Curated annotation (Swiss-Prot):
Gene name in the database record: mnmG
Function: NAD-binding protein involved in the addition of a carboxymethylaminomethyl (cmnm) group at the wobble position (U34) of certain tRNAs, forming tRNA-cmnm(5)s(2)U34.
Keyword hit for tRNA processing: yes
Protein's name according to its UniProt entry: tRNA uridine 5-carboxymethylaminomethyl modification enzyme MnmG
Binding site for NAD(+): 277-291
SUPFAM superfamilies xref list: FAD/NAD(P)-binding domain
Keywords tagged on the record: Cytoplasm, FAD, Flavoprotein, NAD, tRNA processing
Cofactor(s) required for function per UniProt: FAD
Organism annotation: Finegoldia magna (strain ATCC 29328 / DSM 20472 / WAL 2508) (Peptostreptococcus magnus)
Family: Belongs to the MnmG family.
GO cellular component terms attached to this protein's record: cytosol
Biological processes per GO annotation: tRNA methylation; tRNA wobble uridine modification
Length: 627
């Protein structure tokens, strides 16, 4: 670099303005720290480079938790959605997950506007090429233009930009997503800091012209009439609007044949790809290879926004050559006359092994260097946002001299996500799912505010408005449950006739209205005719009351399990600097414990290679040290 010059210092520099970077920067700025968020292109702020939706199974929980902590994703998507659906409604409330289609352009514009209008926050177009560290402390960052920004903390939220390599068959080129510039020099800077990098891969399907498809042969997938907001600040508000349709169709046997005939032209199967792809979002080539007995696969057709004719074709991501893609897409039902607007591609990128991080997402050895999002080996906008807000909070806590802000597995899905990454690591892009969470019934998406907002308010991130709304919600639920306990329903002929009409058994003796609601065939709403004193509650509160009542026993059991879990989580291991000094541990346990540096006995117990007998050895060692 020919000429370097110094710029004004910042408390925090966030590198990357995707979903992790936006939440991180907003958190540090709102906590009073002078923050810069830098992006290779301001046109890619809060970009949705793959699917045009927010939420989904497990992911919706993350968005609600980010919102409960005072984050922005939920508020922005509530303003910019074009379709809303609650998934898994036939199952229990633990796995209900909100999923909405976003208007990509409006989402970008809205989030960019929030960043531009946030106090203490500067949005800067620049490529960060170097991080300077002195005595294991962050000193500055340098941009490609030669500007040196002194800073006390850096949060890396680089997405898929680090040495990004786009692949379409034999055609490969260096690039970030959507034709954006990739970043090579920052990868070299990280390696110079002793941080090992590895390669992961993801992909995206083609975008096709809306008017070139035959929707009459597809199944319409409309949005829900009753729109539930993502942000708790919008609970009780009507945010409904005219919604766009999505569509379901299928690949055919001809699709399968074309892919099989051209597999050797896919970089995945030609040995060009070094990165590991996502297990739970496979390319169409992967599906054909992994499920050879299936002659058809689901394809979802989703609009990208109100101001564009581009349609996102979920389920058909591919790295095949462009001409093969076009031939293959035409064999999908309803795609006979399809016109491509953007071709499908795979992208390979650098990321770290997240076991080098603390649960605050700070590097184990370099103070105030934080990582969030896909650079940690995760996939998905929601996973990125969850990590971003935690990294931002903890960067602020460090610089303000306050205690770390850690969510554990019993606190939040965000806690599960981060614990999995930093404790177990991941060999493939990590996707959040409800099945990863041990305490699903207590960590529902509808109670994220009751779980997290008070803690976020204590550190100054959740606003007074958000906190007071949560307190009112809690008070209303508690009072209604107590009221229902006090109302007796007696076995009169009129009562039993009403019960028969509702498909419920007659009463022999009097019971409380609360116990009546516990019957599987009855709901809170259906019991209104037995409750002359009932006042009208908003739907979101009625559902909360019903969930508390129907699952009371299960929730109590899970709370007991959480109590036991907390005992191990609260046994801190910071007294042990080198596990070689602990006699009786297996060699593998010593290596893993020294590498990962678990913060608690609970975290140590979840490390692969650390056995129950190793945990007992640690327990005995800790007890003897206390004496």
């Amino acid at each position: 670099m020919d000429r370097l010059y110094y710029e004004n210092p910042y408390d925090v520099v966030v590198v990357g303005a995707g979903h992790a970077g936006c939440e991180a920067a907003l958190a540090t700025a709102r906590l009073g720290l002078k923050t810069a968020i830098m992006s290779i292109s301001l046109d890619s702020v809060a970009d949705l480079p793959c699917n045009p939706n927010i939420g989904g199974t497990g992911k919706g929980h993350l968005v609600k938790e980010v919102d409960a902590l005072g984050g922005e994703m939920g508020l922005v998507i509530d303003k910019t959605y074009i379709q809303s659906r609650m998934l898994n409604t036939s199952k229990g409330p633990a796995v209900h997950s909100l999923r909405v289609q976003a208007d990509k352009r409006k989402y970008h514009d809205e989030m960019k506007s929030v960043l531009e209008n946030t106090e203490n926050l500067d949005l800067i177009e620049a490529e960060v090429v170097d991080i300077e560290v002195e005595d294991n402390k962050i000193k500055s960052i340098t941009t490609a233009q030669g500007a040196i920004f002194p800073t006390r903390a850096v949060i890396l939220a680089t997405g898929t930009y680090l040495k990004g390599l786009v692949m379409m068959g034999e055609y490969t080129y260096e690039s970030g997503p959507h034709g954006m510039k990739s970043s090579k020099k920052l990868s070299y800077s990280l390696k110079n800091l002793g941080i090992e990098l590895r390669r992961f891969k993801t992909g995206t399907p083609a975008r096709v012209h809306r008017d070139s498809l035959n929707y009459e042969v597809m199944t319409v997938q409309p949005g829900d009439d009753d729109v539930i907001p993502f942000s708790f600040l919008n609970d009780g508000k009507d945010i409904s609007k005219k919604q766009e349709h999505c569509y379901l169709t299928y690949t055919t046997l001809k699709t399968k044949q074309i892919i099989e005939d051209n597999l050797e032209r896919s970089p995945m199967y030609a040995g060009i790809v070094k990165g590991v792809g996502p297990r739970y979002c496979p390319s169409i080539e992967d599906k054909i290879v992994r499920f050879p007995d299936r002659d058809e696969h689901q394809v979802f057709v989703e609009p990208e926004g109100l101001s564009t004719k581009e349609m996102y074709i979920q389920g058909v991501s591919s790295t095949l050559p462009e001409e093969v893609q076009k031939e293959m897409y035409k064999t999908i039902i309803g795609f006979e006359n399809v016109r491509f607007m953007r071709s499908a591609y795979g992208i390979e990128y650098d990321c770290i092994d997240p076991t080098i991080l603390k649960r605050t997402l700070e590097h184990l050895e370099i103070n105030n260097l934080f990582f969030a999002g896909q650079i940690n080996g995760s996939s998905g906008y929601e996973e990125a946002a969850g990590q971003g807000i935690i990294a931002g909070i903890n960067a602020a806590m460090n610089l303000l001299g306050k205690e770390p802000f850690v969510l554990d597995r019993s606190d939040a899905y965000i806690g599960v996500l981060i614990d999995d990454l930093v404790t177990k690591g991941t060999n493939e892009p990590y996707r959040m799912m409800t099945s990863r969470c041990e305490y699903r019934l207590t960590l529902r998406q509808d109670n994220a505010d009751l779980r997290l907002t008070e803690r976020a308010h204590e550190i100054g991130l959740a606003t007074d408005e958000r906190y007071e709304k949560m307190l009112h919600k809690k008070k209303t639920i508690d009072e209604e449950i107590e009221r229902l306990k006090s109302i007796m329903v007696t076995p009169t002929e009129e009562t039993n006739e009403k019960l028969r009409n509702l498909g419920s058994s007659e009463l022999k003796t009097g019971i409380t209205l609360l116990d009546l609601i516990k019957r599987p065939e009855l709901t809170y709403d259906k019991t209104e005719e037995f409750d002359a004193e009932r006042t009208e509650l908003p739907r979101y509160l009625r559902l909360q009351v019903e969930t508390h009542i129907k699952y009371e026993g299960y929730i109590a059991k899970q709370m007991s399990q959480i109590k036991q879990f907390k005992k191990l989580e609260n046994r801190k291991l910071d007294m042990i600097e080198d596990y070689k000094e602990v006699m009786g541990l297996s060699n593998e346990a010593v290596q893993k414990l020294n590498d990962i540096k678990p913060e608690s006995l609970g975290q140590a117990s979840r490390i692969s290679g650390v056995s129950p007998s190793d945990i007992n050895v640690l327990l005995i060692y800790m007890e003897t040290r206390k004496k």
